[in-house]
Amino acid sequence: MAADKGPAAGPRSRAAMAQWRKKKGLRKRRGAASQARGSDSEDGEFEIQAEDDARARKLGPGRPLPTFPTSECTSDVEPDTREMVRAQNKKKKKSGGFQSMGLSYPVFKGIMKKGYKVPTPIQRKTIPVILDGKDVVAMARTGSGKTACFLLPMFERLKTHSAQTGARALILSPTRELALQTLKFTKELGKFTGLKTALILGGDRMEDQFAALHENPDIIIATPGRLVHVAVEMSLKLQSVEYVVFDEADRLFEMGFAEQLQEIIARLPGGHQTVLFSATLPKLLVEFARAGLTEPVLIRLDVDTKLNEQLKTSFFLVREDTKAAVLLHLLHNVVRPQDQTVVFVATKHHAEYLTELLTTQRVSCAHIYSALDPTARKINLAKFTLGKCSTLIVTDLAARGLDIPLLDNVINYSFPAKGKLFLHRVGRVARAGRSGTAYSLVAPDEIPYLLDLHLFLGRSLTLARPLKEPSGVAGVDGMLGRVPQSVVDEEDSGLQSTLEASLELRGLARVADNAQQQYVRSRPAPSPESIKRAKEMDLVGLGLHPLFSSRFEEEELQRLRLVDSIKNYRSRATIFEINASSRDLCSQVMRAKRQKDRKAIARFQQGQQGRQEQQEGPVGPAPSRPALQEKQPEKEEEEEAGESVEDIFSEVVGRKRQRSGPNRGAKRRREEARQRDQEFYIPYRPKDFDSERGLSISGEGGAFEQQAAGAVLDLMGDEAQNLTRGRQQLKWDRKKKRFVGQSGQEDKKKIKTESGRYISSSYKRDLYQKWKQKQKIDDRDSDEEGASDRRGPERRGGKRDRGQGASRPHAPGTPAGRVRPELKTKQQILKQRRRAQKLHFLQRGGLKQLSARNRRRVQELQQGAFGRGARSKKGKMRKRM
């Protein structure tokens, strides 16, 4: 019988059984732990020894194994802890998310708080390169998340707020709205980093901006003009800046900011990192040499597919004077009432006119243009963003970078003259995976710009077919069609009655017409190829756009087809045959001539019909027109051509003249294409010529005059008269009523900065000195390296140091007073309001009124309770008193 391992036999109590189980479990745990320690020590020593032996064999004899530096190490070289932490943050597996980028916890927490899970393609390409410290020039289509591409590496580089005086990051934006949007996004993404941000914009009070810079911000978000103004006023040095961003870089370099950008770049240190972002950037980095790039990395995504797949485009051929009527019809009938729409116009006069006109037609709208007051711009944009109005009429000011949520439609009232401007306009919709629609009103003189746009996009332009059944809205994308005249007449009649009833609207319409004429004269010319193709297009026979034809009944469509057929009717009789009898000599000659030329006429009509069929189909993006398909072999065509010449003319003198029919050029191009050897043939321009011409900043690849102007060599004269000819230019003086010389006048209106450049003297008006005197702030160098941000303003003439001469300098490391902020807190505002209310109460005799009211209340209570009721009521009324 086996021995019993448990307690003694007999009746067991519950306490004894529990004690026995506890001891047994404790013995098992101790045995397992000792066994694991023995096996781990033996196996671990064996594995470490095996790894060391293998590494020693790879390194060879006599070479020590690399180890981590210890505390006894006397080397001055310390490991880069930032790189080690970043490598530790990276995941071993390829997750494809933000986790694999090695971002710090505050930055990653801000990304997760914002709701981003997976980086976009441009973020996946650019963020690792920027984190490596390289200069980057990046391009991706609108709505692809370019703002986070330069904000996340900036947060990762700056880490947290620094006590050193001076901003460490600078973000330049071309417009106020884009800078405000960048500030909002910076605060949301960098919520947990503790970095301070200052906003320097034109139109705001400079005193507030002085105070913001005295708060020692880490990041400055600014527009170039106001930043230069503040820098000159404060003698601001930017030597601590180590990260510079040019947002919408191509717009910055072409808006006339060259003088301001040169002054800003001259104030930057030599070793800063530069990042350029935009949706349209050329591949020639020579155009951005002024930005101070050092071995930059070019990253361009979506060069071939510049437009989003979720974006639908429609083009309507309308006259210039009927654009307002078509716009009103689109807003009333095509666009859904709950959708938000942005209308792009050419000038501010168009914006003011359309705002007043649409308001009279019960369309809630607002307008924004560059000359508008900054406060009004902010209010109008907020009204549109919050849904107070459904339509926003803007100039190209809002075409760059603005991310308006829930935007569904864009209407190009004035068709853009550049392809990349069209990209930025329609890029306001179809962002972040949403769908959108872009409607464009194209006047007949804007057809060459439309063809240039499709050359730039690499797409084909589809023309609406006349006298065809409506195909619905499925094939509307990228189609050019007419607007029914009945729609135009219906809307235009209402607009004309509105204009007749309003004198103000008539004045705005007249100003808008004059502005349109100035805009047409000043806009850049289209390419010669597009002008030639536009002249060859048959726009008279253009069909209705399917977006409109699908809304009509069958009877209305038949009426429109009848009107189109009447409009396209061309008489075959000549002037000699009209109202002429059969015996008339002129009529007989023309009939004989037509009978003799019947073959040539038939061939010409066949070619014309082929061209018309080709125009009804998609117009390809090639600069030259595609060849028509030939039905007959070339040899038969040549024989037929020879026979027709001999039949028409009785005598042929000299060589057989080449005919100038429609198929001749196509045949020649096909023959030349067959003779080319693709291996040795070098074209005179690259394949992406049209695309790069549209993206170019300096007009490279544009008109011949622009290229020739850049190649002009100005030689110095060899005589005194020729040397001073350029300086002695005369200018009309309106006050003196005569021509005056300009020599030396420019330098009087300019001042020389610390960088040696001359800028306008209006930048220096001693506003900063006046602000310091008002705030009683002592002079200090805001950009001195190593200074602490705790050095605040020092009060002059204080009670403590009165009569002791100059203030004692603070010892290094001791905190000094901070700058008194001009922005009041909520508690200060509430305290000030209560104090004002109390003062107003006392001034109007409030104490006397209060005491009189209390006396009346006591009398009412005494009359109502004492002496006229039960004793219980008297006691209750006493308690209430």
UniProtKB/Swiss-Prot annotation:
<dbReference type="InterPro" id="IPR001650">
    <property type="entry name" value="Helicase_C-like"/>
</dbReference>
<feature type="region of interest" description="Disordered">
    <location>
        <begin position="725"/>
        <end position="881"/>
    </location>
</feature>
<dbReference type="Pfam" id="PF00270">
    <property type="entry name" value="DEAD"/>
</dbReference>
<feature type="modified residue" description="Phosphoserine">
    <location>
        <position position="34"/>
    </location>
</feature>
<feature type="compositionally biased region" description="Basic residues">
    <location>
        <begin position="870"/>
        <end position="881"/>
    </location>
</feature>
<dbReference type="Pfam" id="PF08147">
    <property type="entry name" value="DBP10CT"/>
</dbReference>
<keyword id="KW-0378">Hydrolase</keyword>
<feature type="binding site">
    <location>
        <begin position="140"/>
        <end position="147"/>
    </location>
    <ligand>
        <name>ATP</name>
    </ligand>
</feature>
<dbReference type="GO" id="GO:0016070">
    <property type="term" value="P:RNA metabolic process"/>
</dbReference>
<feature type="modified residue" description="Phosphoserine">
    <location>
        <position position="788"/>
    </location>
</feature>
<dbReference type="GO" id="GO:0006396">
    <property type="term" value="P:RNA processing"/>
</dbReference>
<dbReference type="InterPro" id="IPR014014">
    <property type="entry name" value="RNA_helicase_DEAD_Q_motif"/>
</dbReference>
<keyword id="KW-0597">Phosphoprotein</keyword>
<feature type="modified residue" description="Phosphoserine">
    <location>
        <position position="644"/>
    </location>
</feature>
<feature type="domain" description="Helicase ATP-binding">
    <location>
        <begin position="127"/>
        <end position="299"/>
    </location>
</feature>
<comment type="subunit">
    <text>Interacts in a hormone-dependent manner with nuclear receptors.</text>
</comment>
<dbReference type="InterPro" id="IPR027417">
    <property type="entry name" value="P-loop_NTPase"/>
</dbReference>
<comment type="function">
    <text>Has RNA-dependent ATPase activity. Represses the transcriptional activity of nuclear receptors.</text>
</comment>
<feature type="modified residue" description="Phosphoserine">
    <location>
        <position position="782"/>
    </location>
</feature>
<feature type="short sequence motif" description="DEAD box">
    <location>
        <begin position="247"/>
        <end position="250"/>
    </location>
</feature>
<feature type="compositionally biased region" description="Acidic residues">
    <location>
        <begin position="635"/>
        <end position="649"/>
    </location>
</feature>
<dbReference type="GO" id="GO:0005730">
    <property type="term" value="C:nucleolus"/>
</dbReference>
<keyword id="KW-0347">Helicase</keyword>
<dbReference type="InterPro" id="IPR000629">
    <property type="entry name" value="RNA-helicase_DEAD-box_CS"/>
</dbReference>
<feature type="compositionally biased region" description="Basic and acidic residues">
    <location>
        <begin position="745"/>
        <end position="755"/>
    </location>
</feature>
<feature type="modified residue" description="Phosphoserine">
    <location>
        <position position="39"/>
    </location>
</feature>
<dbReference type="GO" id="GO:0003724">
    <property type="term" value="F:RNA helicase activity"/>
</dbReference>
<feature type="region of interest" description="Disordered">
    <location>
        <begin position="596"/>
        <end position="698"/>
    </location>
</feature>
<dbReference type="InterPro" id="IPR050079">
    <property type="entry name" value="DEAD_box_RNA_helicase"/>
</dbReference>
<feature type="modified residue" description="Phosphoserine">
    <location>
        <position position="75"/>
    </location>
</feature>
<dbReference type="GO" id="GO:0005794">
    <property type="term" value="C:Golgi apparatus"/>
</dbReference>
<protein>
    <recommendedName>
        <fullName>ATP-dependent RNA helicase DDX54</fullName>
        <ecNumber>3.6.4.13</ecNumber>
    </recommendedName>
</protein>
<feature type="short sequence motif" description="Q motif">
    <location>
        <begin position="96"/>
        <end position="124"/>
    </location>
</feature>
<keyword id="KW-0539">Nucleus</keyword>
<dbReference type="GO" id="GO:0006364">
    <property type="term" value="P:rRNA processing"/>
</dbReference>
<dbReference type="GO" id="GO:0003714">
    <property type="term" value="F:transcription corepressor activity"/>
</dbReference>
<dbReference type="InterPro" id="IPR012541">
    <property type="entry name" value="DBP10_C"/>
</dbReference>
<keyword id="KW-0067">ATP-binding</keyword>
<dbReference type="GO" id="GO:0016020">
    <property type="term" value="C:membrane"/>
</dbReference>
<feature type="domain" description="Helicase C-terminal">
    <location>
        <begin position="326"/>
        <end position="473"/>
    </location>
</feature>
<dbReference type="GO" id="GO:0005524">
    <property type="term" value="F:ATP binding"/>
</dbReference>
<feature type="modified residue" description="Phosphoserine">
    <location>
        <position position="696"/>
    </location>
</feature>
